[in-house]
Regions:
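Mid/C-terminal beta-alpha module of Rossmann-like enzyme folds, strongest
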Residues: 225-244
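Conserved Rossmann-fold NAD(P)-dependent oxidoreductase catalytic core, especially the SDR/UDP-sugar
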Residues: 97, 123-159, 178
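Short alpha-helical oligomerization interface
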Residues: 104-121, 151-158
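N-terminal Rossmann/SDR dinucleotide-binding element
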Residues: 1-94
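Active-site helix of classical SDR
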Residues: 161, 165
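NAD(P)-dependent short-chain dehydrogenase/reductase
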Residues: 148, 159, 171-223, 227
Length: 244
């Protein structure tokens, strides 16, 4: 199968490239550089937007190196661009759309980039490849906040640019597409708020090491789920997590 993966150098995308590249012909669209807002900046609560410190830079570089090695030799063509800017003039059997801002907290500081990367990116894909089914990575943030267990019929609503953009993007998907709403994916290659980076930061300032408890799914299990979806394609919208 010929598969285009947007955001193929990102956390989720790189793991998908590594796994699917063993069986399928993979192309990557990814415009990443070190000026990417999620790589360069961090939100520090009341302090607002700041550039990453030395510890955060170290972990981002380590995880970038991990992802680069993860995709090496597993794809056919790499197109260094964003999906809302340019797309390859080729035909594909499937598109997996991972290419967008992944740091929801930063959407308040970069609303235009949030909309472009999430909404305009998918608009471009749907216009450029109208007959190709899309596996779209959305987010549980389309639900806003909730208590208890929810299903896919739970009402949508969000108070931030990220969640609202994800809701808008979902409306662009059609009857042949699959939408996934993961709650939190963790694992190697995640350079944002990885558990080991948070531990490193707490130790550096002599504070207790605290690990937040939340519903989540390990990246390898998420990839397995996507492979099963591809093998048994059933269009629709699905929540995905361990405790969802």
């Amino acid at each position: 199968m010929r598969i285009l993966i947007t955001g193929g150098l990102g956390f989720i995308g790189s793991h998908l490239v590594n796994s699917l590249g063993k069986q399928h012909v993979i192309d990557i669209v990814d415009g990443f550089d070190e000026n990417y807002v999620g790589y360069k900046f961090i939100h520090r609560g009341s302090k607002g937007l700041q550039e990453t410190n030395d510890i955060e830079k170290k972990h981002r570089k380590l995880n970038l190196h991990y992802r680069v090695n993860k995709v090496r030799g597993m794809y056919r063509h790499f197109f260094k661009t964003n999906s809302y800017v340019q797309l390859p003039l080729k035909e594909y059997d499937l598109i997996i759309n991972c290419g967008a801002l992944s740091e929801a907290i930063l959407s308040q500081h970069f609303p235009e980039f949030t909309h472009d990367s999430i909404v305009k990116g998918l608009e471009s894909l749907k216009k450029f490849y109208p007959k190709t089914p899309v596996l779209h990575i959305s987010s549980s943030m389309v639900y806003g906040t909730w208590e208890g267990v929810i299903d896919e019929q739970y009402s949508l609503g969000s108070e931030n640019h990220y969640g609202l953009s994800k809701i808008k993007a979902e409306t662009l998907c059609g009857e042949k597409d699959v939408i996934l709403r993961p709650i939190h994916i963790y694992g190697m290659g995640d350079g944002k708020f990885s558990i080991w980076m948070n531990i490193d930061r707490q130790i550096a300032i002599s504070k207790p090491v605290l690990v937040e408890r939340a519903g989540c799914i390990y990246i390898d299990d998420f990839v397995i789920a996507i492979k099963k979806i591809i093998d048994s394609w059933n269009p629709g919208t699905y929540n995905i997590s361990y405790n969802f």
